[in-house]
Swiss-Prot record:
Gene behind this protein: LOX3
Boundaries of every Lipoxygenase domain copy: 225-919
Protein's recorded name: Lipoxygenase 3, chloroplastic
Tissue specificity of this protein: Expressed in roots and leaves.
Any Gene Ontology CC annotation: chloroplast
Function: 13S-lipoxygenase that can use linolenic acid as substrates. Plant lipoxygenases may be involved in a number of diverse aspects of plant physiology including growth and development, pest resistance, and senescence or responses to wounding. Catalyzes the hydroperoxidation of lipids containing a cis,cis-1,4-pentadiene structure.
Cofactor: Fe cation
GO molecular function, one term: metal ion binding
Organism whose genome encodes this protein: Arabidopsis thaliana
Family: Belongs to the lipoxygenase family.
Amino acid sequence: MALAKELMGYPLITERSSLVSSASHFKKRTQSTQFSINPFDRRPRKTKSGVVAAISEDLVKTLRFSTTTGDRKSEEEEKAAVKFKVRAVVTVRNKNKEDLKETLVKHLDAFADKIGRNIVLELISTQLDPKTKLPKKSNAAVLKDWSKKSKTKAERVHYTAEFTVDAAFGSPGAITVMNKHQKEFFLESITIEGFALGPVHFPCNSWVQSQKDHPDKRIFFTNQPYLPNETPSGLRVLREKELKNLRGDGSGVRKLSDRIYDFDVYNDLGNPDKSSELSRPKLGGKEVPYPRRCRTGRQSTVSDKDAESRVEKPLPMYVPRDEQFEESKQDTFAAGRLKAVLHHLIPSLKASIVAEDFADFGEIDRLYKEGLLLKLGFQDDIFKKFPLPKVVVDTLQESTKGLLKYDTPKILSKDKNAWLRDDEFARQAIAGINPVNIERVKTFPPVSNLDPKIYGPQHSALTDDHIIGHLDGFSVQQALEENRLYMLDYHDIFLPFLDRINALDGRKAYATRTIFFLTRLGTLKPVAIELSLPPHGPKHRSKRVLTPPVDATSNWMWQLAKAHVSSNDAGVHQLVNHWLRTHACLEPFILAAHRQLSAMHPIFKLLDPHMRYTLEINALARQSLISADGVIEGGFTAGAYGMEMSAAAYKSSWRFDMEGLPADLIRRGMAIPDATQPHGLKLLIEDYPYANDGLLLWSAIQTWVRTYVERYYPNPNLIKTDSELQSWYSESINVGHADLRDADWWPELSTVDDLVSILTTLIWLASAQHAALNFGQYPYGGYVPNRPPLMRRLIPDESDPEYASFISHPEKYYFSSMPSLAQTSKFMAVVDTLSTHSPDEEYIGERQQPSIWTGDAEIVEAFYGFAAEIGRIEKEIEKRNADPDRRNRCGAGVLPYELLVPSSEPGVTCRGVPNSVSI
C-alpha cells in the first residue's frame, strides 16, 4: 500500500510532527499542489490540494539550541539551529538474470555493505549557504538494508536513507550518489518525504558505477524543470559540472561504463586489417559528406591510420552506459540474432547438397509451413555430411520446433497471390513499407539531373506513345494537368553506381523509373517502367521501356521489371529513407542534446523519451548491418557501395527543413498548401494511407509541442537568450552535420514557431516516420518475391544469348534472378528481428513514470491530453481501415494500413509507433 501511495504521489509518512515553535521556523505552503495520477489512467485529472510537512515522531528530532548570551539571534541562525530528519525512498531495479561473476560480486557487495562500504547519498538545496556561498547540503546518508535485501528476487527493490537538515535548508534541488560497492546498479528513482512542500521526486533511470570505475559522485536533479537563467543559485555549479562530465574532453578510449557523448566520423565500417577487400571509405568530411556518429576513441587499424579498428560480435560497441539496451530489450534482440544465425547456417550447409535457387513458388511457401530443415527432408543428409558437435546438432534439431520456421508474412495473409497484381504493386507505393518516394510527375518525359557528359542524355526514353493507351481516355497533357501521373524515380541515385554494382558477383541492377496513373476510383496502376544502364558507346542500348503485358512473354518480362523496381525501392528504402533519414541524421541531435541540455532543461525532458535506445541500435548497425560484408552489403543490390549511395543521397537531397511531413509531401508534389483543408494541406491522392494517418499524428505532436514550448517560452527573447538551447541547436548543425553546416536551408532558432517546428520534426522522425518505415519490413518484405532486396540477372532481350533459355523456362529464369535460398533466409531472419517490438517498448503517448517525469503539474496534465488524442487517432485509423470507399486500405485481399496505429503488442505486428528509433 505504501508503494502504491508513493507511485501516486502521496507522502509515505502520515503522522504529524510536534515541532518546537514550528510556526516561527517553517513557512508552510498552504496553496502548493501535488499532482497525483494513476499511470494507467489517461483521463485528465484535477490537481489535488497541497501536502504540508508530514514528519512522524520517529523520524523527527528537533534540537533547539538555547541562547547562552541572551542576545537575539538572526532568523537564519534560528532556523539553522533547528534540525530535523527527512527520509528518502530509493528504488533500484534488479537484473532478472545474472551470470556467475555478477552473482559472486553481488554477494561480496552485500558483505562489504555490512562493514561500511555503502551506497552514500547527500541532499543538496536549491539555495546557497550565505556564509560559505556554497550549496547547502545535508549530512551524508547511507542506503539502509542493502545487505539484508541482496537476495530479493523482485524486479524493483525499495531502500531508505535518512538525512538531517536544518530549517533553513530550503527546497531540495539535487542529490549525489556514491557507489562504494564493486558492482554497478540501476537507480530508477528517489523520493524524499518530510519537507513542507510535499514529496520531492528524482526520476533517475541511470546506472550508477562503482567508485573504483568513476570516483566522482553522481548528480541527480529533481523533476522540476528550469531554463538556464532560472536555475536556483544552489544548482548552477552542479548544472554545468554535470554537462561537463557528459561532454568529456574528446580524448581517450571509451570504456563501456563511461557516460561521455562525443562526435566522430563513420570510419569504422571497414576492416582493412582483415582484408583489403573489406576497406571502406570514410563517411564524413569534404570528400564524402555524412552525419557524425558517437565517438568511441578506439585505436586506428594497422593498415589504414584513418580507419578505426573494429569491434566484432559478440563484443559490445561503446555507447554511453545509459544508452545501452535494458534487459528485456537485450533478450529480444539476442533471440532475433540467434534466429538469424541459425537461419543463415542451415541454407549455407544445404547449398552443397541441393540446388541453391528456389525451384518454384511452392518451395518458398514451404519455408513458412515446414521450416528450413524439414522443407525438403534433408536434415539427416546435413548431419551425415557435416560431423557437427552434438550440442550443435541438438540445438538445430530443437530449433526446428519453431525457431527455424518462419511466420507467414502479412502480405500473404489475405490473398497470397495479391502481390503479383499490378494494382497491389502500385498500392504499396502509397501504403506499403516505403510510401515516401512516390512523387507527382510535373514534366513528361522525366528529366535527369545527372551530368549528361558522363551519364548520357538527361531526357528519359519514355514517350507519350508508351503510356497513352493506359490513361483511361486522358491525353498525357490532360493527365498532367489533372494531377494523375505519379512516379517512383530511382534513376539518378542508382545510375552513378551501376557499373560497379553490376561488376559484383551475383548482382545485377537497373536504374528504374516507374510511371503510375491515378484512376477515377482513386487507385494507382503502373503504366510504364523504364530500365536504364550506363551508356557504353553510341550504339549501346542503355535505356529500355516496358509496358503492361499483352501476352505470356511480355507478362514474364513485366514481372521481372517490377521485381527490379522493387529491388531499387528496397535499397533506397533501407539505405536512405530508413537508415540515413531516421537513424543517422538523428544521432547528432541526440549527442548534442546530452552534451548541451541539462537534465533540468524543459526541452531535454520533452525530447528524452524520443532519444531512447537510438545510439545503441545505431552502434549495432555499424557493427553488423551497414559494415563491410555486413547484412546490408550481403542482402541488398548495392552491395559494398550501399553506404556510398546513402552518402550521395545525404549530399544531394537531405534537407532538415524538408523532413517534416507537410514539407515533404509538398516537395514531392503529393500535396499543395490549402488553408481551408485539415492540416492546411490538400492531398492530391485523397486516399494516401501513409499521408492520411501521418498528418493526424503530425498535428497531434505539433499541438503537444506548441503547448509545451509556450509554457516555458512566453516570449521569443527567452529562446534567443537560452544559452543551452542555442548551444544544442548550433552543435547539432555545426558539429553533428558539419559537412552541410553552410547550407542556407537550416531553419533559424529565434521564435516560438521556429522551436515548435524543429522539435516537432525531430519527434516525428523518431516516432511516426521511423515506425512507418521499419515495422512493416517483415510483413511486406518477408515474402521475398514481393520485395526482392537484390536481383542477380538482367532482363534478356531478343539479342541476348540468355533469351532462348528465358523463353523455354521463364519461371526458372525468374527464380535465378531472385536472391538465392541462403540470401533469402538470412534476409528474412534479419528483417524479422528488425520488425519486432520488444516487451519494454514505449509508444507515443506513453512515458516512464508518467505522473512524475516533470514537476510541472500543468505540463503533466497537458501530456495526458496528448495521450488521449493519440487514443482518438487510433480509433480513427481503425475506422478508416473498415471504410470500403478507401480502396487503398480496404477491400478483398487488401491489407489494412496499420503501420501508424499508435499501440502494439510485443512481436512482429505491422503496427505500433514507439517514441524513439529503438530498432
